[in-house]
């Protein structure tokens, strides 16, 4: 046995080559019309966060995409609502393909697109990129969470707004990644509710960074960045309770300003702010609408987890997707469609009242 064989990859079962980001982009190109939509809506998000556009950013959609057909039906409905409220809201659809797990579980469409534990990542990458192309072709901009540093090379050119989640905001890898991403990025506060990790992350990502990554041709590369000027903070609640109330928002905005960061922020109506109760999300959205209507300037955006069917269902990877209810989440419980349309109307009305 060679010496290297005695010490390397002892717990690795196999390596499977994947197409490079450039190869997948050539197969599924962004196209001029989609690229124009992405560029325009990224600039609109930037202007909203800076207070130059008085609309509200609303990032809304399924907790995760597991069924592309149902996701496209949702997108078709959402684009109608986005057009209805276009003078008051910039609606961006959640298109989340990677899910962080506290222990184990389904890791998302990219990792396991067949929902059966087969981990066909090549198909997952292809499905994710195709889905983003289909949604943007409808005129609907897309948002996603960036969970690791390789997959963005396959999808980021089709993404208008990105998030770094509560479990990864403190990670140096994700701060470095965000510094080089081409779209506005929001960092969630920590799972314990602490805000400082998000402040530190936003500051770090706005600065130039150098790190190990991959280039479009798939080669390992030294990546040097200019820093991302469009970083912000997302209040999502935490172990110590919700943080969407007027005092929470005001204090967070003051801390952002004191740190020299964008003082306007995004509030997540789900997760710790709803106690993971999808019914409670609608109540949180209504309370945020009241803050906005009362003239609160710190809230630039709201996040909602929403699907065609309310609630959630358990995915059994041993069975696969055959028994699943179409349009219902297999991860976090979501608001149903009717509640979503109502929440969007309330948020739009709050913007009009604030003017």
Identify what each model region corresponds to.
Residues 57-70, 332:
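Conserved phosphate/anionic-ligand binding catalytic regions in large, soluble enzymes, centered on
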Residues 49-52, 79-86, 132-139, 223-225, ...:
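Acidic (Asp/Glu)-rich catalytic clusters
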Residues 68-80, 103-111:
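Glycine-rich loop at the start of a catalytic domain that most often binds anionic cofactors/ligands
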Residues 61, 267, 336:
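Conserved, mostly hydrophobic/aromatic
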Residues 293-355:
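Active-site or pore-adjacent capping/gating segments
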Residues 20-29, 225-239, 324-328:
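Gly-rich Lys/Arg/Thr-decorated short loops/hinges at beta-loop-alpha junctions or inter-strand turns
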Residues 8-52:
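N- or domain-start disorder-to-order transition segments that initiate the globular core
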